[in-house]
Curated annotation (Swiss-Prot):
Keywords: Endoplasmic reticulum, ER-Golgi transport, Golgi apparatus, Lipoprotein, Palmitate, Transport. It comes from Mus musculus. It is found in: Golgi apparatus, cis-Golgi network; Endoplasmic reticulum. This is Trafficking protein particle complex subunit 3. It comes from the Eukaryota.
Length: 180
């Protein structure tokens, strides 16, 4: 019995490592394809956005989470359910703005950066920028326009990885004329 449980853990670890290495290969290829880090950062954000737009359906189906009533509830669902479900981590939520429209997600351990060291000639690269795009894309599909950006990164010598989230506005559904 314990042997099977051990296989499941090993399989999950191998799957996680394969994902990390595959993501690293993707970023490496983007660095070769684009001339500067800013273009790579934009491409990672765009790719993440497209993933988020599709991932939200899977998330809603698998998590049985209902509609969030405010940005604080949304932050809790992102940190405690979504990150746990897809990356196996639970970031902490800190640094709320007084207005309640901004917060930080603190990742003590970012699984995307395992085995990674940024070369000196890529100091402007935001290696995990895909995550910001995923957050923007997924939240847009549930009628929330947000800004997501990295403000700290362990790859750049910071103690933790921090993603700053800012609520911009609620997106209204605009139905085509004649459809309601």
């Amino acid at each position: 019995m314990s042997r099977q449980a051990n296989r499941g853990t090993e399989s999950k670890k191998m799957s996680s490592e394969l994902f990390t290495l595959t993501y690293g290969a993707l970023v490496t290829q983007l660095c070769k394809d684009y001339e500067n880090d800013e273009d790579v950062n934009k491409q990672l954000d765009r790719m993440g956005y497209n993933i988020g737009v599709r991932l939200i359906e899977d998330f809603l189906a698998r998590s049985n989470v209902g509609r969030c009533h405010d940005f604080r509830e949304t932050a809790d669902v992102i940190a405690k359910v979504a990150f746990k479900m897809y990356l196996g981590i639970t970031p902490s939520i800190t640094n709320w703005s007084p207005a309640g429209d901004e917060f930080s997600l603190i990742l003590e351990n970012n699984p995307l950066v395992d085995f990674v060291e940024l070369p000196d000639n890529h100091s402007a690269l935001i290696y995990s920028n895909l995550l910001c795009g995923v957050l923007r894309g997924a939240l847009e599909m549930v009628q929330m326009a947000v800004e997501a950006k990295f403000v700290q990164d362990t790859l750049k010598g910071d103690g933790v990885t921090e993603i700053r989230m800012r609520f911009i506005r609620r997106i209204e559904d605009n139905l085509p004329a004649g459809e309601e």
